[in-house]
Amino acid sequence: MDLTKKWHRSEFVSHEMLEVHRGIECELDFYSAIANGEIELVQENCNEQAFTNPEGMGVLSTDALRNIRYHYVVTVALITRFCVHEGLEQEKAYNLSDFYILEMDKCKTIEQISKLHDVMCLDFCKHMHEIKNGQVLSKQVVLCLSLIHI
């Protein structure tokens, strides 16, 4: 069966099973809260364990552990880009991203990945909180500095 036929069959089955993904607004609001350094909001979301709630979560793998790993990597990548866009120095953001993905590789359970997810989100958020509340430099200056290789 070619991929187009497989895709159409998959789409039909999803439609018939009434499978619906979570609304993108909640996800974008969460990433924005991190990028804006809103620690309390991010902590609340982490406490709700929304990351591991299977309702509305896409299926990136039929293996539950692999599925959460893939979602984790996507989450880290998006948070990294949101934070860079809001003023986190690019190299620092990518180093944080790499660090947390490598740490996730060591996790053996969904629970370990979930805990690491919360730590990672709050770490990025705290970096952004410091930038937003103590930044003397404009976003444009931070961008220029990230382009200068010393």
Annotated model-derived regions:
Residues 148-150:
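Conserved small/polar residues in nucleotide/adenosyl-binding loops
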Residues 1-128:
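Hydrophobic, helix-rich cores of sensory/ligand-binding and other regulatory modules
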Residues 137-142:
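Short, leucine-enriched amphipathic alpha-helices that occur as contiguous helical runs
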Residues 128-135:
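Short alpha-helical interdomain "coupling" segment at the junction between an upstream regulatory sensor module
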